[in-house]
Amino acid sequence: MTSSPVPPTNSSDSSDSKVWSQRFESALNPVIAAFNASIHFDIALIEYDLTGSQAHVQMLAHSGIISQAEADAIDQGLEAIRQEYRQGQFQPGIEAEDIHFAVENRLIELIGDTGKKLHTGRSRNDQVGTDLRLYLHDQILQVQTLIRNWQQALVILASDHVQTLIPGYTHLQRAQPISLAHHLLAYFEMAERDWQRLREIDRRVNVSPLGLGALAGTPFPIDRQYTADKLGFADLYRNSLDGVSDRDFAIEFLCAASLIMVHLSRFSEEVILWASEEFGFIKLKDSCATGSSIMPQKKNPDVPELVRGKSGRVFGHLQSLLVVMKGLPLAYNKDLQEDKEAIFDGVTTIKACLEAMTILVAEGLEFQTPRLESAVGEDFSNATDVADYLSKQGVPFREAYNIVGAVVKTCLSQNKLLKDLTLEEWQQFHPQFADDIYSAISPRQVVAVRNSFGGTGFTQVQNALEQAKTLLSQSK
């Protein structure tokens, strides 16, 4: 079945015809009906709802609960609804209450009483849990792809800046010079943890609750493993009460999403700072910046500012779902309807932010190399290397540290940098200072000697780049 002469029902004039309405003596108040409905947002689950229902009816036939002919008719009817939805012809209103009733009602319109057998051996409680897990599994894979794209953009940019120096900061005070590529690859590592975290979470998402019923299982001889295999689930819930009420997987996803946004927001903050006149480390290219309505000279970093701001949305969704879950008795409660908008918007937000930040890194940032080079040579961020120099001459490090503190204090009082001191002045502080002190404290040498594993030394950074490229190539 690919089409039907039966027109889809899109009106909202049947609010008293709920599936459950025979239990009640009067119709639901229209305001309460609208308040109760979730169709306006859980329509996002329709493809997964249809897929889950198709697996369910084939299981019913496989288990001898309905005939194969009935299962095939239902399956074809569900596929017809899928095509109607994709063509914009199936647009249920609030009279449907939720996507599950909307699909079931439309199925009965299309194929008649056989459609009433769809829900045999199933509750909306295990049905929605199945839909949500199928949706989230799919979205996790998409987010992981976007993370890889973000990492790829970072690697490409870092490849151009292994030899570019930039001040490294602690407490937002200049600390030690580093390779710009090393700085960019720090975000690659954060993103890799994000990717791995999602993989771990997906193991717990990919567990089937289908067939658990409302809360206690079902008396029908169903085969839960059959539907799990059909839908690609790796495991089954072992307790019906837990399975229909569990939203740990959703909370875990929002935790992971929040960490993704933390990392994107941190990078955004740095881009905003670096693009300011006060730093002047980067210029934003026209394709990734906007202007002011009143100040014609402005070029605003809207992309990183929006990402920084949108992080709060995702954090809020995590908090809201934690609060929803904290007081719920077993098993299902209507409060759980509140999980979907948090998840849907969380997914939409992180996907949009990853896409935007990938474009920003790939084409929107122009590092001002001369400014960066001058920035690492106009301060005392090489002071640690003076202490290291003395330590290598046999001076205990703490003693060397105190000597260098006195050197810096003297330089500040005389408005000098370390490189401006004469050898005679150096030797007034300690006789071990020699001519090679000048090369030892040059910014490029300061970076080059930090060649321990994971350090900013140029050799280490190049090795890290190659490892990152290998990781990305292996994950394709």
From Swiss-Prot:
Enzyme nomenclature, EC number: 4.3.2.1
Source taxon at top rank: Bacteria
GO-annotated cellular components: cytosol
Enzyme class: lyase
GO biological process: one example: L-arginine biosynthetic process
Reaction catalysis annotation: 2-(N(omega)-L-arginino)succinate = fumarate + L-arginine
Compartments, as annotated in UniProt: Cytoplasm
Principal location class: cytoplasm
InterPro entries in UniProt: Arg_succ_lyase_C, Argininosuccinate_lyase, Fumarase/histidase_N, Fumarate_lyase_CS, Fumarate_lyase_fam, Fumarate_lyase_N, L-Aspartase-like
This protein's pathway: Amino-acid biosynthesis; L-arginine biosynthesis; L-arginine from L-ornithine and carbamoyl phosphate: step 3/3
Record HAMAP family: Arg_succ_lyase
NCBIfam families (alphabetical): argH
Record's protein name: Argininosuccinate lyase
Naturally occurring in which organism (per UniProt): Acaryochloris marina (strain MBIC 11017)
Gene: argH
